[in-house]
């Protein structure tokens, strides 16, 4: 089933952009390879289960697949990161209202519409997360889907 899922997702067009995932444990300080399909959301509030996750990771993806239109819950704005995707740790950004800094991860490569440098990435992430913090709570349809429980490994460790 897993190989069929990956094969099917691989056929979808890549959707470059910034996507988010709740994060458990310390911020990564090196590269990591995604070990399984990693669900993320274009909405930081969804990805962090209303900012209850230990941390939030912002991922600059070149190859992520937008699966929201195919999802049972399209309002989650899900973007799948495929297995074997290499994510580089490119820093953190402090956001007022969050206990821990947002972890910044990025695929190698470029695509139109992505931040041109780390300063622009920090600015865009700060704006998106600040806007999400101001929104009302989002109904969590699938607890743990976008944010592993505290102490549970992330998709690449």
Label for each model-derived stretch:
Residues 1-157:
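Mono-ADP-ribosyltransferase
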């Amino acid at each position: 089933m897993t190989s069929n899922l990956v094969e099917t997702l691989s056929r979808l067009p890549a959707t470059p952009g910034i996507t988010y995932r709740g994060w458990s444990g310390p911020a990564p300080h090196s590269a990591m390879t995604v070990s399984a399909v990693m669900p993320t959301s274009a909405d930081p509030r969804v990805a962090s289960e209303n900012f209850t996750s230990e941390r939030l990771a912002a991922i600059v993806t070149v190859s992520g697949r937008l699966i929201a239109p195919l999802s049972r819950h399209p309002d989650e704005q899900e973007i799948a990161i495929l297995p074997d995707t290499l994510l580089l740790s490119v820093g953190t950004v402090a956001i007022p209202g969050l206990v821990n800094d947002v972890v910044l991860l990025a695929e190698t490569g470029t695509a139109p519409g992505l931040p041109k440098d780390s300063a622009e990435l920090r600015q865009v992430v700060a704006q998106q997360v600040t806007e999400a913090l101001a929104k009302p709570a989002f109904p969590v349809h699938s607890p743990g889907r976008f944010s592993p429980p505290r102490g549970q490994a992330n998709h690449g460790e």
